[in-house]
Amino acid sequence: MARYRCCRSRSRSRCRPRRRRCRRRRRRCCRRRRRVCCRRYSARCRRRR
């Protein structure tokens, strides 16, 4: 898992990188957490701002 995929996609297990639907707040979350889906762990990323 070299590249991180954030935002929602067709499968919940697989998150694809979609910057168009990704919000600015969630986008930062994705950059910090490269092992989890930005949307699924949005709350956790918010805590570790």
Curated annotation (Swiss-Prot):
Entry GO CC: nucleosome; nucleus
Family label: Belongs to the protamine P1 family.
Entry superkingdom: Eukaryota
Name of the protein this chain belongs to: Sperm protamine P1
Biological process terms in GO annotation: chromosome condensation; sperm DNA condensation
The organism of origin for this protein: Rhinopoma hardwickii (Lesser mouse-tailed bat)
GO molecular function list: DNA binding
Tissue: Testis.
Classification via InterPro entries: Protamine_P1
Protein localization: Nucleus; Chromosome
UniProt keyword list: Chromosome, Developmental protein, Differentiation, DNA condensation, DNA-binding, Nucleosome core, Nucleus, Spermatogenesis
Protein purpose: Protamines substitute for histones in the chromatin of sperm during the haploid phase of spermatogenesis. They compact sperm DNA into a highly condensed, stable and inactive complex.
